[in-house]
């Protein structure tokens, strides 16, 4: 049984389905008590990649997604507290040229998290 699982994982790895492995840390254990999501609208989509490059330089931002709808980008970030969030938003994110509006959503609690389901027992 273990051999079958090992072979399946190896096949998934070789085919590029598995992108790697990593340690997952709990941000709260490191003192980051606020998880927030920010929708970002740009004045002009021609600066999209420049904006992404600037956002990459903000270590509190852990994810950035291109999205459809009202906003162009959606970022996830972790901050120590609400004051840290406000400073990050006002002094760093809104300081990026070309950002016209943002909307911030604070996560009250994570209900669950998971990776996409892969059936390791069947091909």
Can you name each region flagged by the protein language model?
Residues 2-123:
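A compositional/biophysical signature of low hydrophobicity enriched in polar/charged and small residues
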């Amino acid at each position: 049984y273990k051999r079958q699982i090992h072979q399946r994982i190896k096949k998934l790895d070789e085919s590029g389905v598995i992108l790697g492995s990593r340690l997952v840390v709990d941000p709260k254990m490191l003192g980051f008590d606020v998880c927030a999501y920010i929708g970002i609208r740009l004045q002009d989509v021609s600066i999209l990649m420049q904006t992404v490059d600037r956002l990459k330089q903000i270590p509190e931002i852990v994810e950035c997604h291109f999205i459809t709808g009202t906003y162009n980008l959606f970022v996830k970030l972790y901050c120590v507290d609400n004051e840290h969030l406000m400073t990050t938003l006002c002094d760093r994110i809104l300081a990026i040229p070309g950002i016209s509006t943002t909307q911030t959503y604070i996560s009250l609690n994570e209900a669950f998290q998971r990776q996409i389901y892969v059936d390791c027992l069947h091909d």
